């Protein structure tokens, strides 16, 4: 008792870590038994104190940190500023996400750090504080959620949600916070369930690989070892200690000439401390890798047992212990993972702050401007940068390390504690980085524009992906887009104003086929509502006539061939009333009069100038067309019977002019040559008979089968079949048409239609007659083209004549085939161009024709010019809104076509929400054309401006009260990529003389009122030119700036502005006010500007822009794709798959890929240097040694990141099994092993020494599953998986199982060879001692060394082998 008074008393609280150290020291000093007695007393003391304390926990004990309020408020303020920057287009979505996460993460971390001091100051005996911070129950993160804030959560995919949960569990969550919280909780539940099963299966596979590894010998006699050195500084002291404790030395350790540790000595704590203190040379230790035993392990290579601290006992099943040691932490960690919504592993960067107020000075030549990862402007320094801070009385130098961001400018004044630089946190080795694609989607629809900072040529030839060389903004210009899938059908031209009743709005031009009445009523809806109240009433044709060519002329598909730069076809759509029987027939929207001009623009005499496809001469069935001719057969009267012989066609086959023709329908099937036909030739079938496996007949009749090269043509002729007698005259003829009532048959007297008689001969002697029905088409004038085209077009001008003819499209007796359900046009109504041949014009055989489209003040005129020498025919049609039409729909003018009178009432019509201006956009896809409609809701007006505080006179404002987009602009901003359209720009000028010059339009000099602005034609190259071709003034609109001047044209300017300029939000463009919305300037007027609303989107270098310039963007379309690096989540649920990938050697990540490349490279080089016999041996040894070290490090990295300590020995035993096999290659033939066979490395070495020829093999990394199926025991393999296959293979090969492992003995009910059952298996074999491989491996990082080092390390090996070969030869001699 007296001694106890002299003992030192430590009045200190003890946590879990300190308790571990105490127990470890107790075991070292007193042993296991006495330590257990001491710990029992500690336990009893703890229970007594806990009972006396009687801690209870209530909801009032959860105290919220007082500073939380202003911390959250500060974070919200930062988030609001960040949101504004994103809205302005200053930061993009990835930068916003990063910064938002970092703001809330730092707020949450600060709250977590404040927790402990707050409890200590306010309530040190708080039960929550006592329990959590003593380590008894609950960790810091759990308490932080109770009294701090829950913070950031992750969604089920593991992505961070940037909306943080600001409340804690004590305060309670709002509905939104509760739902977000459930996201993270659900992820935790799913991960726990799924990963626990994965961890269990991983444990099973690990145990399967190493279940036969048992300690069976004391020493295997190896002289090899792996070197570990504390000198390199890269290995922390803690890890160095963990690696060495419990190992056995492979070599003596010297300090100078003094030996401080001997070979085969086990290493304890004292010896490790001496190594660290003396900084000795690299230490060679024995590991399971170096053990020479093939299927077991020796005591010295394993080292100390972790249970009792002495060398492991013989017969201990260290393999099963190793498998469970690796698998069990995974199971435990998944069960006790507490999810706070994903661990934020990014960390915050370190900051350099100014020590006091002063001015910053640094060398600007050493820094480069850049953007930080949060989108802030900064300078990047590549080398060490010295920054000087000058104050009034002192100088202070700050060293900024390389690759840091400088956040201040040169000569800038900084305040004390201001952040001046950001140091990039060193890349943590435990965090895995991954590249992630982030797609930014459009939240509005409109038209895409970008600046010249984007490569306009796409990355690939036919792609729509553009790369950014530097940061720039994309703009989505507002407007309502509508898509048309038929290029040739566009009712509206560029710059038209439309109303909401138009077809573009109602149908959106998606429906390509509808009934004629529907089409007609949609066309005429705004115009004939008053006149036609009933749906079935046919419209007034005078109205239709008046508007058909005025409002609906549009270019056809071939006008979009941009290279030709000319329109060579126009279609004039119109409709007419069909009969009730054919009311439901569908017609394509492209019906109408097609005026087609050859590409070279030259017409020959009598050539077709325009044509129209009449729906009355349209059929859906296949068949034969027949015309009337004068030739007849002698046996029948002329008027009764017509026989058709071959008629020479006097025109091309599709331009026959006839008055009447006949159509004989038939069903035709074109089948592949390999088809199996279920009907015979000349057989008679009924309706819906199966012809092939997938085809049935639509009609009944006679089948005719014709086999051609690669196809079969099957025809079905419908009609009546007769077997006539010899007296029938008609039966002797075939291929004749019979008029109604003119046959000799009694049954045919009631027939009112024509018949077609065809003779069919199935055999030589038999025949029958098929009488087929005929459809007769009488070709009448139908709808006269003269009523559909303006009268002046058909009038003769000079010698030019236009005549209407009907032509049949198919030759006499030609077969017409319909594809699926498409209809066949039989007759085409054509307009033929001709001219009289006077004596003067006798040599004229050609006429030139062209379309001229002229737009002036929004009225578009088409001029059709047919030039015959000096004569010309002009057709003028004018299009605009319906009120501008005259009664007959036509306005003729003899004025100069490039001029139109300025009429205010016509131009200043009020906007309504359903009315807007159409802009036509022709993309690369010729099959799809898009519209964009701008209405007043998409634009806003700034102004009137004030100059020097003086407003403009009211008169000048009244003049232009309404905004008219139509008369003002085309595509703006950059180089135009649209062709074939004339655009109008207006110029604002304050020089009256210049205005007069511009307005000299041909012979109209100064007759027009001088206006403040005027419109000019613009060609496809984007050059504005005035129509007065005498004055050579060419203006480029993109270089012009307009000055806003006082109304009396004084010289003071207020603002300079460019048409087409993009303006960001809150940019001041006028005095005494802010500009509130972003957009593009589309109209610049004398006292105001009109800005089209636009939305900016920032894109940084390396980003990918989708879509072309000027393309229509719809809501939800992908705009930009960013690629950025993201830290992977660090919890064990993410780590387990990595462990599995390493152990299964899957080349999914860069882990195995790099390893495989290094292995292949070494195999090749070693063979070249050492030759084939020893190249394989040394190459395999080095490869296996390096890959083993790499695999152990990868697995340890995952577990250490979770704070789990697994001894390297356990992992080494597993890795030894998956790297101990080699693959016999096909390079050299061997009599023992087959190419592709897996054998053990030691077995390959022994066989190679025994044989005279070398065995060619290469190292292979087996996964744990493959290693389990490639063992020496087929019973063990069969009990793992693929039982039937393994047993059948073993039976066929006659394998023998020596029952050396645990599992096979358990399966067969024998005694397992471990523990007490081990003694029966102990045998000492001396034959292994003679097969020593004197191979030393002392350098851990072998693969980085030079080749001469490898030769140095393996000199003993080469010498011994060389001497052995010499000895063998001398014996043979």
From Swiss-Prot:
GO cellular component, one term: chloroplast
EC class name: transferase
Source species, domain of life: Eukaryota
Cofactor or coenzyme needed: Zn(2+)
Subcellular location: Plastid, Chloroplast
Cofactor mode of binding and number, as noted: Binds 1 Zn(2+) ion per subunit.
Record's keyword terms, sorted: Chloroplast, DNA-directed RNA polymerase, Metal-binding, Nucleotidyltransferase, Plastid, Transcription, Transferase, Zinc
SUPFAM superfamilies, sorted: beta and beta-prime subunits of DNA dependent RNA-polymerase
EC number(s) recorded for this UniProt protein: 2.7.7.6
Primary residence: plastid
Biological process terms in GO annotation: DNA-templated transcription
Disulphide bond pairs: none
PANTHER family: DNA-DIRECTED RNA POLYMERASE SUBUNIT BETA
Function: DNA-dependent RNA polymerase catalyzes the transcription of DNA into RNA using the four ribonucleoside triphosphates as substrates.
Assigned protein family: Belongs to the RNA polymerase beta' chain family. RpoC2 subfamily.
Protein name: DNA-directed RNA polymerase subunit beta''
Native organism: Silene latifolia
Gene coding for it: rpoC2
């Amino acid at each position: 008792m007296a001694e106890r008074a002299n003992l030192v008393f430590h009045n200190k609280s003890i946590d879990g870590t300190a308790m571990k150290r105490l127990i470890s020291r107790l075991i070292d000093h007193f042993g296991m038994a006495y330590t257990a007695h001491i710990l029992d007393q500690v336990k009893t003391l703890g229970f007594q104190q806990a009972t006396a304390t009687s801690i209870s926990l209530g909801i009032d004990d959860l105290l919220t940190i007082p500073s939380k309020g202003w911390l959250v408020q500060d974070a919200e303020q930062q988030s609001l500023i960040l949101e504004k920057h994103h809205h302005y287009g200053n930061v993009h979505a990835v930068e916003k996400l990063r910064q938002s996460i970092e703001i809330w993460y730092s707020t949450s971390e600060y709250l977590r750090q404040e927790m402990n001091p707050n409890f200590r100051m306010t309530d040190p005996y708080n039960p929550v504080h006592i329990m959590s911070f003593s380590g008894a129950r609950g960790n810091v993160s759990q308490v932080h959620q109770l009294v701090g804030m829950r913070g950031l959560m992750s969604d089920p995919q593991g992505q961070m949600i940037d909306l943080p949960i600001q409340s804690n569990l004590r305060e309670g969550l709002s509905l939104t916070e509760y739902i977000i919280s459930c996201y993270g909780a659900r992820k935790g539940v799913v991960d726990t369930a799924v990963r626990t099963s994965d961890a269990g299966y991983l444990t099973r596979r690990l145990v399967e690989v190493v279940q036969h590894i048992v300690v069976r010998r004391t020493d295997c006699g190896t002289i090899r070892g792996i070197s570990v050195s504390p000198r390199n500084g890269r290995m922390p002291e803690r890890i160095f200690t963990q690696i060495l404790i419990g190992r056995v030395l492979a070599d003596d350790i010297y300090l100078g000439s003094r030996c401080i540790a001997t070979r085969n000595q086990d290493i304890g704590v004292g010896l490790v401390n001496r190594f660290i203190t003396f900084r000795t040379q690299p230490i060679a230790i024995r590991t399971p890798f170096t053990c020479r035993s093939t299927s077991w392990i020796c005591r010295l290579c394993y080292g100390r047992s972790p249970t009792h601290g002495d060398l492991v006992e013989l017969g201990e099943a260290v393999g099963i212990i190793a498998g469970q040691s690796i698998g069990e932490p995974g199971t435990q960690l998944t069960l006790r993972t507490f999810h706070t919504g994903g661990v934020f592993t990014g960390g915050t960067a370190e900051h350099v702050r100014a020590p006091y107020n002063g001015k910053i000075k640094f060398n600007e030549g050493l820094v480069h401007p850049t953007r930080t990862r949060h989108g802030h402007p900064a300078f990047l320094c590549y080398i060490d940068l010295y920054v000087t801070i000058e104050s009034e009385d002192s100088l202070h130098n700050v060293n900024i390390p390389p690759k840091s961001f400088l956040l201040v400018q040169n000569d800038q004044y900084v305040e004390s504690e201001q952040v001046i630089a950001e140091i990039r946190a060193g890349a943590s080795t435990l965090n895995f980085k991954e590249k992630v694609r982030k797609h930014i989607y459009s939240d509005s629809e409109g038209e895409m524009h970008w600046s010249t900072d984007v490569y306009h040529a796409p990355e690939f030839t036919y792609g729509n992906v553009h790369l950014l060389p530097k940061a720039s903004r994309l703009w989505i210009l507002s407007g309502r887009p509508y898509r048309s899938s038929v290029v040739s059908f566009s009712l509206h031209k560029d710059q038209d104003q439309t109303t909401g009743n138009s077809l573009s709005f109602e149908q959106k031009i998606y429906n390509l086929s509808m009934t004629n009445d529907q089409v007609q009523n949609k066309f005429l809806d705004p115009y004939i509502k008053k006149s036609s109240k009933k749906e079935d009433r046919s419209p007034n044709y005078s109205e239709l006539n008046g508007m058909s060519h005025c409002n609906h002329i549009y270019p056809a598909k071939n006008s979009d061939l941009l290279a030709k730069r000319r329109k060579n076809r126009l279609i004039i759509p119109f409709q007419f009333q069909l009969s009730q029987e054919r009311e439901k027939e569908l017609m394509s929207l492209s019906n109408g009069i097609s005026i087609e001009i050859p590409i070279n623009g030259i017409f020959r005499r009598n050539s077709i100038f325009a044509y129209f496809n009449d729906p009355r001469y349209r059929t859906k069935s296949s068949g034969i067309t027949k015309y009337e001719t004068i030739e007849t057969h002698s046996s029948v009267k002329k008027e009764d019977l017509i026989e058709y012989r071959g008629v020479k066609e006097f025109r091309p086959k599709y331009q026959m002019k006839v008055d009447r023709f006949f159509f004989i329908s038939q069903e035709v099937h074109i089948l592949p040559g390999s088809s199996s036909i279920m009907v015979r030739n000349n057989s008679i079938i009924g309706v819906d008979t199966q012809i092939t496996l997938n085809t049935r007949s639509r009609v009944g009749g006679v089948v005719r089968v014709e086999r051609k090269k690669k196809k079969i043509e099957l025809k079905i002729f419908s009609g009546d079949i007769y077997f006539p007698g010899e007296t029938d005259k008609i039966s002797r003829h075939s291929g004749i048409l019979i008029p109604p009532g003119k046959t000799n048959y009694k049954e045919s007297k009631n027939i009112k239609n024509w018949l077609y008689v065809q003779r069919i001969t199935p055999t030589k002697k038999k025949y029958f007659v098929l009488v087929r029905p005929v459809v007769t088409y009488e070709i009448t004038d139908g709808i006269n083209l003269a009523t559909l085209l303006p009268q002046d077009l058909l009038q003769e001008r000079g010698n030019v004549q236009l005549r209407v003819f009907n032509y049949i499209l198919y030759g006499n007796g030609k077969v017409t085939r319909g594809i699926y359900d498409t209809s066949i046009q039989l007759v085409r109504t054509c307009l033929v161009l001709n001219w009289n041949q006077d004596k003067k014009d006798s040599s004229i055989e050609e006429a030139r024709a062209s379309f001229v489209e002229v737009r002036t003040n929004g009225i578009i005129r088409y001029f059709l010019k047919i030039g015959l020498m000096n004569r010309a025919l002009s057709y003028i049609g004018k299009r605009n809104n319906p009120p501008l039409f005259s009664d007959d729909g036509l306005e003729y003018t003899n004025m100069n076509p490039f001029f139109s009178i300025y009429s205010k009432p016509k131009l200043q019509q009020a906007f309504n929400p359903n009315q807007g201006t159409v802009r036509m956009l022709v993309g690369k896809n010729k099959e799809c054309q898009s519209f964009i409609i701008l209405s007043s809701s998409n634009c806003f007006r700034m102004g009137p401006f004030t100059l020097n505080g003086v407003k403009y006179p009211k008169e000048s404002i009244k003049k232009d009260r309404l905004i008219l987009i139509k008369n003002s602009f085309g595509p703006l901003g950059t180089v135009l990529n649209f062709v074939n359209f004339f655009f109008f720009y207006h110029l604002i000028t304050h020089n009256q003389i210049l205005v007069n010059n511009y307005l000299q339009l041909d012979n109209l000099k100064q007759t027009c009122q001088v206006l403040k602005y005027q419109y000019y034609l613009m060609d496809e190259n984007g050059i504005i030119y005035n129509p007065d071709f005498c004055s050579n003034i060419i203006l480029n609109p993109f270089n012009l700036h307009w000055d806003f001047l006082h109304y009396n044209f004084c010289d003071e300017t207020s603002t300079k502005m460019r048409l087409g300029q993009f303006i960001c939000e809150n940019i001041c463009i006028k005095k005494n006010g802010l500009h509130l919305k972003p957009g593009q300037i589309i109209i610049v007027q004398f006292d105001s500007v009109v800005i089209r609303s636009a939305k900016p989107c920032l894109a940084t270098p390396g980003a990918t822009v989708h879509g072309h310039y000027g393309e229509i963007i719809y809501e939800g379309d992908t705009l930009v794709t960013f690629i950025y690096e993201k830290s992977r989540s660090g919890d064990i649920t993410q780590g387990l798959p990595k462990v599995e990938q390493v152990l299964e050697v899957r080349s999914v990540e860069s882990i195995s890929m790099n390893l495989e490349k290094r292995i292949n490279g070494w195999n090749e080089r070693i063979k070249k240097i050492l030759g084939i016999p020893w190249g394989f041996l040394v190459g395999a040894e080095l490869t296996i040694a390096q890959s083993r070290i790499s695999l152990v490090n990868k697995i340890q990295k995952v577990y250490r990141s979770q704070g789990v300590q697994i001894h390297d020995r356990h992992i080494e035993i597993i890795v030894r099994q998956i790297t101990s096999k080699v693959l016999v290659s096909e390079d050299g033939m061997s009599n023992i092993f087959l190419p592709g066979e897996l054998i053990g490395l030691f077995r390959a070495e022994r066989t190679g020494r025994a044989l005279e020829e070398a065995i060619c093999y290469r190292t292979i990394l087996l996964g744990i599953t493959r290693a389990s199926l490639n063992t020496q025991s087929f019973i063990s393999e069969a009990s793992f998986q693929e039982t039937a296959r393994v047993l059948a293979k073993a039976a066929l090969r006659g394998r023998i199982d020596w029952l050396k492992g645990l599992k096979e003995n358990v399966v067969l009910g024998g005694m397992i060879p471990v523990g007490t059952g081990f003694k029966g298996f102990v045998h000492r074999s001396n034959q292994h001692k003679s097969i020593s491989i004197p191979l030393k491996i002392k350098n851990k990082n072998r693969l980085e060394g030079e080749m001469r080092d490898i030769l140095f390390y393996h000199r003993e090996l080469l010498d011994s082998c060389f001497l052995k070969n010499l000895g063998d030869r001398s014996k043979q001699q």
